Every structure is written in structure tokens, then in C-alpha cells.
């Protein structure tokens, strides 16, 4: 998994080693039979705060009841255009979400290309995989991959992504150079959730933020 995540090229940009995103995939196996596994996955990513040694959580998502097959020494292959395996699709899907979330904190809606590719992965996986984990009804039909990428690619939720952008770039990143302005911007960003909640109550992206 480590090789798969670090050796695949997820964007058209080039990055130095220290620019790589600090993230983790915690996979807890809850059932298995031969090479077939059922697991819960917790995905975390962190973002450095400008001019500090502090990292802040940027993305946390728990995906319960995922299914995949894996044999010892099996290569995990990724393709942008076709389904290879559930494990490959899972790892690629969340890798792109992590990168998209990171980009969104530096420029408004900058992660949309990654989100669109993640949606493409979900679409072809739901067509060719026998697993129900790609469907909108997975995990009770609310907190799942389908609705996550639906929210991230919809213009209806741009205001929530803008809150995340302002919270990080105009808030946390300014704390060292101008803490008063930074705190004001952080408060303003969080207060915007109250306005957003009137139109999009308890949305999935709001739940992820907190």
C-alpha cells in the first residue's frame, strides 16, 4: 500500500519530498476468508501551518464495511480509465480526495480536478465491482464514498469548501504574522457555517470539518 500511494503520480505537478502530504490509512480487518477481506478504514490527512512547526488536521473520514480481495505479493495496479480491483480503487479514490482537500486550502476550489477523477473511479467501480460499498445506499445511505464525492463535485457546496479555505489560508496561516487578524478570520469562517446550515443542514462536508 505504501508503494502504491507513493509511487503513483496523482497530479500533473512535480513535488519535492518535503512537499508530500502527511496522511494515514488505518485499515482494521473485521472479517476475512482466504483472500477476501471486510474492513473499516479511517483516512487522515494533515496540513502544515505557515511559519510554524504545527500540522493541522485537514481531512478525516471513516469508511466502514469496505470489501476487497488481496493475495500475498499481489501487485496493486491503478488505472484512470478502467477498474482493476476494489483495493486499488479505494486507495486511489481517497488519495485523490486527500490531494483535493489539500489544494482547496491554498486556492479556492483548486482540488476540483482530483475530485472529478475520484468520481470517475467511483463510477467505473460501481459498474464493474460486485461490492455494494460504491453505492449511495452504503452505510445507511449517508456517510459513504458516493455522497462524499457528490458533495465535493457539486456547486451547491462551494461555500463549505470556501470556509475550509479561509480557515486555513486566511486564518491558521496568519497566526504567526498577525494573530489578531488570523483569529478574526477564523471566527468569521466558522460563523459562516451557521448561514450555510440554514440551506444545507448537517451536510456531510460540515460533519467532516468538525
Cite the ranges covered by each PLM segment.
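Start-of-domain marker
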Residues: 2-51
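Alpha-helical context
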Residues: 3, 17-19, 67, 71-75, ...
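Structured segments of extracytoplasmic/periplasmic soluble domains
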Residues: 3-11, 94-105, 189, 193-196, ...
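Glutamate identity and glutamate-enriched acidic tracts
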Residues: 7, 17-19, 42, 80, ...
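Residue-identity detector for threonine
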Residues: 11, 28, 56, 81, ...
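Aromatic-enriched hydrophobic runs in primary sequence
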Residues: 15, 22, 30-32, 90, ...
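Acidic/His-rich structured neighborhood in mature extracellular/periplasmic domains
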Residues: 35-150
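Flexible, glycine-rich surface segments
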Residues: 110-208
Amino acid at each position: 500500500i505504501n508503494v502504491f500511494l507513493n509511487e503513483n503520480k496523482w497530479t500533473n505537478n512535480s513535488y519535492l519530498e518535503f512537499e508530500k502530504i502527511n496522511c494515514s490509512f488505518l485499515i482494521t480487518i473485521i472479517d476475512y476468508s482466504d483472500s477476501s477481506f471486510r474492513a473499516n478504514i479511517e483516512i487522515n490527512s494533515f496540513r502544515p501551518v505557515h511559519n510554524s512547526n504545527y500540522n493541522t488536521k485537514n481531512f478525516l473520514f471513516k469508511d466502514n464495511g469496505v470489501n476487497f480481495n488481496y493475495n500475498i505479493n499481489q501487485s496493486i495496479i491503478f488505472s484512470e480509465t478502467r477498474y482493476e480491483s476494489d483495493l486499488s480503487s479505494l486507495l486511489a479514490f481517497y488519495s485523490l480526495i486527500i490531494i483535493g482537500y489539500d489544494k482547496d486550502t491554498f486556492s479556492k476550489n483548486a482540488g476540483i480536478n482530483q475530485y472529478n477523477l475520484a468520481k470517475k473511479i467511483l463510477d467505473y467501480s460501481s459498474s464493474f465491482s460486485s461490492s455494494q460499498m460504491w453505492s449511495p445506499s452504503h452505510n445507511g445511505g449517508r456517510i459513504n464514498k458516493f455522497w462524499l464525492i457528490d458533495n465535493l463535485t457539486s456547486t451547491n457546496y462551494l461555500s463549505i469548501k470556501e470556509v475550509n479555505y479561509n480557515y486555513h489560508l486566511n486564518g491558521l496561516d496568519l497566526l504567526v504574522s498577525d494573530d489578531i487578524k488570523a483569529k478574526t478570520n477564523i471566527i468569521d469562517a466558522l460563523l459562516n457555517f451557521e448561514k450555510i446550515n440554514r440551506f444545507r443542514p448537517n451536510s456531510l462536508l460540515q460533519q467532516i470539518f468538525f
